[in-house]
Amino acid sequence: MTLIHPTAVIDPKAELDSSVKVGAYTVIGPNVQIGANTEIGPHAVINGHTSIGENNRIFQFASLGEIPQDKKYRDEPTKLIIGNGNTIREFTTFNLGTVTGIGETRIGDDNWIMAYCHLAHDCVVGNHTIFANNASLAGHVTIGDYVVLGGYTLVFQFCRIGDYAMTAFAAGVHKDVPPYFMASGYRAEPAGLNSEGMRRNGFTAEQISAVKDVYKTLYHRGIPFEEAKADILRRAETQAELAVFRDFFAQSARGIIR
């Protein structure tokens, strides 16, 4: 059986595993590498120094590895790296990285990216995330594991969203969202704990209670932020589910939502 449609345009320098399926009118550039059992629908365009792993499913009209929307970009050989087992739906756009950033845009494994989502240059997305339709990341955004972005979520450049966090429909994320927390609103504010997401991913009632106490410490007890952070970091030394806060606070540059 022919796995590549005869109307697809694939540069002879591109490296595709023999099991890759390519739909009609798809265009694949010379510096693209695609791993085993990845399926690409019709009318997709994959350019740039783009590496795509195994068992991905890329739907029609996706645009992957196009140059970043950055006026400083001067055709440097920056990268887009996509892991394994991702679903990338219609009209998604993933841009290359920039030399003024980390030089690459990275997406991990088992992510579910719905239609019309956008990942700008130098974004880093972890594993097992869900991006609902039209969620968009500006440049240099970091998304942790098991994050859920509601439809039309917009994330400002350089923001971080921690593991297991969740945003509501049309959230405008202008500061960092701590792990496990929910954010909502045009200028996103804390909206409670993603306790249902934690339960679905195997957290115990005791672990959820410990994280809930962190939320209360940050937002409901009137404690100055630096004192609250120090208290959380002390608890993180003995409570494994709180360890993610240590790295999150250390890497946060924009401050957290309040």
Curated annotation (Swiss-Prot):
Q: Which GO terms describe its cellular component?
A: cytoplasm; membrane
* Protein's gene: lpxA
Keyword terms of this UniProt record: Acyltransferase, Cytoplasm, Lipid A biosynthesis, Lipid biosynthesis, Lipid metabolism, Repeat, Transferase
CDD domains, sorted? LbH_UDP-GlcNAc_AT
Supply the InterPro entries for this chain: Acetyltransf_C (IPR029098), Acetyltransf_C_sf (IPR037157), Hexapep (IPR001451), Lipid_A_LpxA (IPR010137), Trimer_LpxA-like_sf (IPR011004)
Where does this protein come from, organism-wise?
Neisseria meningitidis serogroup A / serotype 4A (strain DSM 15465 / Z2491)
According to the record's subunit comment, the protein's assembly and interactions are:
Homotrimer.
Gene Ontology terms describing biological process? lipid A biosynthetic process
Stated role: Involved in the biosynthesis of lipid A, a phosphorylated glycolipid that anchors the lipopolysaccharide to the outer membrane of the cell.
Enzyme Commission designation: 2.3.1.129
State the family named in the UniProt similarity comment for this chain: Belongs to the transferase hexapeptide repeat family. LpxA subfamily.
Metabolic or biological pathway, per its Swiss-Prot or TrEMBL entry = Glycolipid biosynthesis; lipid IV(A) biosynthesis; lipid IV(A) from (3R)-3-hydroxytetradecanoyl-[acyl-carrier-protein] and UDP-N-acetyl-alpha-D-glucosamine: step 1/6
User: Which chemical reaction does it catalyze?
Assistant: a (3R)-hydroxyacyl-[ACP] + UDP-N-acetyl-alpha-D-glucosamine = a UDP-3-O-[(3R)-3-hydroxyacyl]-N-acetyl-alpha-D-glucosamine + holo-[ACP]
Location of the protein in the cell: Cytoplasm
Domain of life assignment: Bacteria
State the top-level EC class.
Answer: transferase
Q: What is this protein called?
A: Acyl-[acyl-carrier-protein]--UDP-N-acetylglucosamine O-acyltransferase
State the Gene Ontology terms under molecular function. Answer: acyl-[acyl-carrier-protein]-UDP-N-acetylglucosamine O-acyltransferase activity
